[in-house]
């Protein structure tokens, strides 16, 4: 069968680098002013969903930094689902987070804990558990170790909500269903941080210049993505056939590019807070071969075959049958 991935991987609309003029249309003010940068911006139309298992100390630090960044900078909703033997988040992260954020900023956070002795972290299923709780028009599938420039968040949401003028046809708006808020290529900044450095980052009102030990690295399809929530659910959310780690990011991009032809990418950087990796977050996990076979199968599908698969695959049918509150 013909492989359709190559042409779809390149069929993305590239957004020019963000300028104050572009973002000021969203926040209605000039974001170059320091007092504006310290403001909390409105992202009520977006819910961030973050799957979590804290296996290392640096992972604990990363989720704390990420949540402080999101909750201080944006009026938004964040759902964190933690699956583990016991809740390290409740024991160690939540008290520090409450100390760092005022009560009104914590209102947007929902923490769900599911007790499990299972070693395997079924990331795709956990993401879907949260996705089907989302009631906002935009959803961001968000890794716990990721930071974006502050301006990237409202611009990505605005693209989905309000479209992009003249992106494909002169004088017409184009509405992406998925936005990758970072460039493809060496747009990843790998951050090797310390407690002292992230504390300085937070206290400096999130000045990324604080991080002096980083290197540029490849960025493709992981980290985080903004979705039109309705479309995300209609096309199956995350494929629960992918277990633990491996190939789910590739398949997700291929699926939405192939079926919707409405995937946008921003020419911006993504910051990744580095961390130690267990088998659940690397290619030596026991499910990697099954994941690879599923990816090989799906990337050989044509558009109508992919649509048929996601209309009929068991987990997605069960999810869509859940009544909406």
Regions found by a protein language model. Name each.
Residues 136-149:
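Short beta-strand-to-loop acidic/aromatic patch adjacent to the donor-nucleotide binding site
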Residues 131, 149-240:
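Conserved catalytic core of nucleotide-sugar-dependent glycosyltransferases
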Residues 46-62, 73, 81:
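A conserved hydrophobic helix/loop-capping motif in glycosyltransferases and polysaccharide synthases
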Residues 65-77:
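Short, acidic, metal-binding catalytic loop of nucleotide-sugar glycosyltransferases
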Residues 123-128, 145-146, 153, 220-224, ...:
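Conserved glycosyltransferase catalytic-site signature
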Residues 55-56, 81-97, 146:
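A conserved acidic beta->alpha catalytic loop
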Residues 2-32, 41-43, 58-62, 219, ...:
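C-terminal catalytic/acceptor-binding lobe
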Residues 88-133:
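Active-site-proximal specificity loops/subdomain of glycosyltransferases
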């Amino acid at each position: 069968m013909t492989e359709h991935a190559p042409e779809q991987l390149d069929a993305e609309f590239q957004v020019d680098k963000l300028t104050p003029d572009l973002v000021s249309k969203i926040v209605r003010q000039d974001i170059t002013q320091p007092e504006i940068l310290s403001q909390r911006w409105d992202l009520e139309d977006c819910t961030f969903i973050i799957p979590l298992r804290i296996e290392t100390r640096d992972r604990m630090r990363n989720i704390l930094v990420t949540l402080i960044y999101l909750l201080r900078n944006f009026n938004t909703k964040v759902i964190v689902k933690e699956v583990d033997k016991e809740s390290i988040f409740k024991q160690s992260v939540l008290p520090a987070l409450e100390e760092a954020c005022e009560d009104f900023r914590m209102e947007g956070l929902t923490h769900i804990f599911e007790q499990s002795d299972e070693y395997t972290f079924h990331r795709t299923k956990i993401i879907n558990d949260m996705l089907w709780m989302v009631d906002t028009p935009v959803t961001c599938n968000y890794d716990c170790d990721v930071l974006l420039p502050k301006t990237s968040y409202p611009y990505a949401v605005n693209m989905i909500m309000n479209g992009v003028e003249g992106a494909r046809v002169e004088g017409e708006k184009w509405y992406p269903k998925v936005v990758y808020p970072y460039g493809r290529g060496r747009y990843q900044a790998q951050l090797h941080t310390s407690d002292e450095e992230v504390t300085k980052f937070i206290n400096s009102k999130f000045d990324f210049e604080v991080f002096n030990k980083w290197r540029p690295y490849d960025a493709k399809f992981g980290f985080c993505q903004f979705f039109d929530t309705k479309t995300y659910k209609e096309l199956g959310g995350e494929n629960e056939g992918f277990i633990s780690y491996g190939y789910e990011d590739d398949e997700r991009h291929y699926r939405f590019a192939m079926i919707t032809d409405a995937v946008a990418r921003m020419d911006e950087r993504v910051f990744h807070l580095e961390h130690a990796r267990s088998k659940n977050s690397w290619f030596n996990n026991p499910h990697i071969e099954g994941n690879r076979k599923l990816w090989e199968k799906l990337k050989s599908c044509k558009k109508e075959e992919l649509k048929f698969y996601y209309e009929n695959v068991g987990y997605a049918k069960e999810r869509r049958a859940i009544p909406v509150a």
